[in-house]
Amino acid sequence: MASSAFAFPSYIITKGASTDSFKSTSLSSSRSLVTDFHLLFSRPISSGPKYQSAKSAKPESPVAINCLTDAKQVCAVGRRKSMMMGLLMSGLIVSQANLPTAFASTPVFREYIDTFDGYSFKYPQNWIQVRGAGADIFFRDPVVLDENLSVEFSSPSSSNYTSLEDLGSPEEVGKRVLRQYLTEFMSTRLGVKRQANILSTSSRVADDGKLYYQVEVNIKSYANNNELAVMPQDRVARLEWNRRYLAVLGVENDRLYSIRLQTPEKVFLEEEKDLRRVMDSFRVEKI
C-alpha cells in the first residue's frame, strides 16, 4: 500500500510449553513409590524368641531363623526403596526448579519478504498479522497489544528519491519523524498533553551495501484527572502511557521505505535485544 513520504499511518493499535503433563507424570511416579514403600513395611513380621540367658538358651528353631531372615530382607528392600524414592523426589525438585530456564528459550523469528514492493524484515514468530490496518503490512504482539510493527513506503509517482541523503542528515530526518508522530497523536480531548523527545538518530550501511537511517523517540501522554475543574490545583495530570518508537528508513526503487515499531517503554527495556534485531533486519530490495 503506497502513501506519500513520511505519511505514516494515523492509527494506534493498543495492544507459552505447558509443564502440567510433566508434573503429573513425575508426581504420579512418586506416589507409586510411596505406596510401594508403605506396602513393604505393612507386611506382618514374625518376631523371634524372647531373650534368654546363655545357660538356659536353646538352639533356635528353623522357623524362628526363617522369620528373622524375612525381616532382614524386608528391611533391606525397604531401605533400597526409600533411597530410590529420595533420589526420585530430589530429581523432581531439581527438574522443577530448572523448568523456567528450560522453557525460556531464545525467541524464534520469521522473515517477511515482499518481492512485489521490494522489502523484507524479521519479526517474532508469535506476532500476528492485522489486515486492513492502513499500512502496507502490520504485525502486533497478541499479548501486549500496544506493541506493533508496520511498514510503509512512498508512491514512485509522487516522489523520486535516489538516496536518503536527499532528505538531509539523520538529525534532520529525526526532527521530521518527530513532527509526524506528534501530528498523528494529536488529541482533541481537554487536558491531554503529549511530551516527546528524540532519543537518538543514526545512520548505518547494512550488509546489502545500502544506507539506512534509524530514529528513536519517546512519547508520553498525560491527561488531567478532572479536565473541567476551574482551579488549576484540581486538575492533576496523570501519565496515560509511555512508549518507545523506533523507525528505520531506506531508499530504493525511487521510493522512501520506513519500518516503524511501537512498544511500551517498560516492555522495550525487557525486550530491547530482540526488538533491535527486528529493526536491524529491515532491508529494501530492487524490483
Swiss-Prot record:
Pfam families linked: PsbP
Listed GO MF terms: calcium ion binding
Domain of life, source organism: Eukaryota
SUPFAM superfamilies documented for this protein: Mog1p/PsbP-like (SSF55724)
One term under GO cellular component: chloroplast stroma
Signal peptide: none
Gene3D superfamilies cross-referenced by the UniProt entry: Mog1/PsbP, alpha/beta/alpha sandwich
GO terms, biological process: photosystem I assembly
Compartment list: Plastid, Chloroplast thylakoid lumen
Keywords associated with the record: Chloroplast, Plastid, Thylakoid, Transit peptide
Effect of a null allele: Seedling lethal.
Role noted for this protein: Photosystem I assembly factor that assists the proper folding and integration of PsaB and PsaA into the thylakoid membrane.
Record's subunit section: Partially associated with photosystem I (PSI) complex, but is not a subunit of the complex. Interacts with PsaA and PsaB, but not with PasF.
Family the UniProt entry places it in: Belongs to the PsbP family.
Name the record gives this protein: PsbP domain-containing protein 1, chloroplastic
Organism listed in the record: Arabidopsis thaliana
